[in-house]
């Protein structure tokens, strides 16, 4: 901002302080003001300034730089603006230290990066600190492209990059997913000899970690001389972000036991995530103990990671104990507890927690809607949908995908379609939720059309997509289409069929009366010893008098795999009765008694809507 604009902008503030009144001992007073600035006592410094005539205390760059830095330190932006006005009036805006102090003030306390940029574009001489501050400000404000533009601008002015500007540039590349450009900056780092710098090496490890290049992240780490805790945490995080949880745990123990380094809160949070995703409750408890030993147990971020770990490991009671012991709770900790109950099928409890929450973030809405879907509680789901709308929250892909899932599972396919059609942003979860909704509600042809449209738009179907489309084919008797999709998933998309896909195919073939084809398909599968899959086929076989021999084979196979599973005995006994083999039916019942097989009483519930 040039001098005229600055004077116009700050004229209203210039008279708010430094009111002149004659006094003495100016040099002593200036020294006292500088001393007060060091101590962060801004109010007292201003009092002395206001009691002194302006001619007695010269307007020096050192004085104004100190005052501006103190404003920054004590979070007083209004006084900072007033001093900014006096800087302009005194003609000190060209001084480098004053300019950098102003830049720091606006970056930390100002209304936005636009105003900070105006200060940066002022008349002061920029140095490495100025350019670094500007880049860091843009990165912090998630304006990553602008951060890189500042880097280019800096180089065009003939200034050389330092480790801080390079670190900001690499961080910007990380968030933009620009791995190739990040590699170029990595080359510049090596050219300048900064590869030994822990700070920039950690940033490089982060670049590769968040962009699915964990091998390169490890390579950067291995080249670090005596990596510190931040470096170890960076590569731990890289492994964790790429689902390499075993490697992350191994690295943690190497750091803690082998190198004797004391992990910080970020390290513990990362390794607890690994334990949770691996369902390693014993190791999670061990790390919980280390947290307490190291005095980090009361950190709200770490405690939220503990909640998440216990929830994923199925230990909701211990998660609740951690939560109850927290001195401070934030939306993350509430969300972690809510997610723990939901993941473990305690949907009613999850809904209770949601109602207790004072501050609800969007993640909580997504989680509680999953709980509603698990209970088929569409009426409550609609109530939560209403809360979401009343908050003016539109366009959240997680919440709106959860709404589609809820409405689909509750039979409200039209509501699911309306939510889907209004979404401005969709991801893979959204596509799969809508595809599943169509499949579960008998809209097989629409599901096939939707799937084909998805592929045409360049959306690559995943594991879940094929479960949904095979379910759709099964529910509407589209046998040929189902066979084609089953082959397509491995041949064209490299997706190895899992238990769920075989279950869909067996159900499809069983509904069509193709029992022997289903039996042969299952015999060739790697999951052929999964009794639940044979159970899928046994139901339709046992209900078909012409398939009694196949049903008999399957039931006996199930009895071998799971001798205590009651349904194989019950279905076979019922089939024998249906075809007049009452003696065989009685023998099966006696076999149940000898083996101590108890029949489980079924239960169900509905939600009226």
Curated annotation (Swiss-Prot):
Keywords from the named record: Repeat
Region called Type E motif, residue ranges: 533-609
PPR repeat ranges per the UniProt record: 25-59, 60-94, 95-126, 127-161, 162-196, 197-227, 228-263, 264-298, 299-329, 330-364, 396-426, 427-461, 462-497, 498-532
GO biological process annotation, one example: RNA modification
Keyword Ribosomal protein set for record: no
One Pfam family per UniProt: PPR_2
Entry GO MF terms: RNA binding
UniProt entry tagged with the keyword Iron: no
NCBIfam families named among the record's database cross-references: PPR
Family note: Belongs to the PPR family. PCMP-E subfamily.
PANTHER family: EMB2261, PENTATRICOPEPTIDE REPEAT-CONTAINING PROTEIN
Protein name: Pentatricopeptide repeat-containing protein At1g03540
């Amino acid at each position: 901002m040039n001098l005229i604009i600055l004077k116009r902008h700050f004229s209203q503030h210039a008279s708010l302080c430094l009111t002149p009144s004659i006094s003495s001992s100016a040099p002593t007073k200036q020294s006292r003001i500088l001393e007060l600035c060091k101590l962060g006592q801004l109010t007292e410094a201003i009092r002395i300034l206001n009691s002194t005539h302006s001619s007695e205390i010269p307007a020096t760059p050192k004085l104004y730089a100190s005052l501006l830095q103190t404003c920054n330190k004590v979070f007083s932006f209004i006084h900072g603006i007033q001093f900014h006005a006096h800087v302009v009036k005194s003609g000190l805006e060209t001084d480098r230290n004053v300019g950098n102090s102003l830049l720091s003030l606006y970056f930390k306390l100002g209304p936005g990066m636009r105003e900070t940029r105006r200060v940066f574009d002022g008349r002061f001489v920029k140095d490495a600190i100025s350019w670094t501050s500007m880049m860091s400000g843009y990165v912090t404000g998630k304006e990553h492209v602008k951060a890189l533009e500042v880097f280019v601008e800096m180089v065009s002015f003939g200034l050389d990059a330092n480790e801080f500007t390079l670190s900001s540039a690499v961080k910007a590349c990380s968030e933009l997913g620009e791995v190739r450009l990040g590699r170029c900056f990595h080359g510049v780092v090596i050219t300048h000899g900064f590869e030994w710098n822990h700070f920039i090496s950690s940033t490089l490890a982060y670049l590769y970690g968040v962009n699915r290049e964990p091998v390169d992240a490890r390579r950067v780490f291995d080249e670090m001389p005596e990596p510190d805790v931040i470096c170890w945490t960076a590569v731990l995080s890289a492994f964790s972000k790429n689902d390499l949880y075993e490697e992350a745990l191994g690295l943690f123990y190497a750091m803690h036991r082998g190198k004797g380094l004391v992990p910080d809160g970020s390290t513990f949070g990362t390794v607890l995530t690994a334990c949770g995703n691996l369902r390693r409750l014993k190791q999670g408890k061990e790390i919980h103990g280390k947290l307490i030993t190291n005095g980090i147990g009361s950190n709200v971020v770490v405690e939220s990671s503990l909640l998440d770990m216990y929830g994923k490991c199925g230990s909701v009671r211990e998660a609740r104990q951690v939560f109850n012991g927290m001195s401070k709770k934030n939306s993350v900790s509430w969300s972690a507890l809510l997610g723990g109950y939901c993941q473990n099928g305690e949907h009613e409890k999850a809904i209770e927690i949601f109602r207790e929450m004072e501050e609800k973030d969007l993640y909580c809405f997504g989680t509680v809607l999953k709980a509603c879907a698990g209970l088929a509680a569409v009426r409550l789901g609609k109530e939560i949908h209403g809360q979401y709308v009343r908050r003016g929250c539109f366009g959240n892909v997680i919440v709106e995908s959860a709404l589609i899932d809820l409405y689909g599972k509750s039979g409200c396919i039209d509501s699911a379609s309306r939510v889907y059609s209004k979404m401005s942003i969709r991801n893979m979860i959204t596509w799969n939720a809508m595809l599943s909704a169509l499949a579960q509600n008998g809209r097989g042809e629409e599901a096939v059309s939707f799937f084909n449209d998805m592929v045409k738009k360049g959306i690559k179907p995943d594991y879940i997509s094929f479960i949904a489309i095979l379910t759709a084919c099964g529910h509407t008797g589209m046998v040929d289409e189902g066979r084609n999709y089953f082959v397509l998933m491995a041949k064209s998309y490299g997706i190895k069929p899992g238990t769920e896909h075989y279950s869909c195919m067996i159900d499809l073939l069983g509904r069509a009366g193709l029992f022997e084809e289903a039996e042969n398909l299952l015999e060739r599968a790697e999951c052929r010893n999964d009794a639940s899959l044979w159970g899928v086929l046994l139901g339709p076989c046992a209900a078909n008098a012409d398939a009694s021999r196949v049903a008999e084979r399957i039931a006996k196979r199930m009895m071998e795999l799971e001798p205590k599973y009651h349904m194989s005995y019950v279905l076979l006994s019922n089939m024998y009765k249906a075809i007049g083999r009452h003696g065989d039916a009685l023998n099966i019942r006696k076999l149940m008694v000898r083996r101590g097989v108890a029949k489980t009483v079924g239960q169900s519930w509905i939600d009226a809507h």
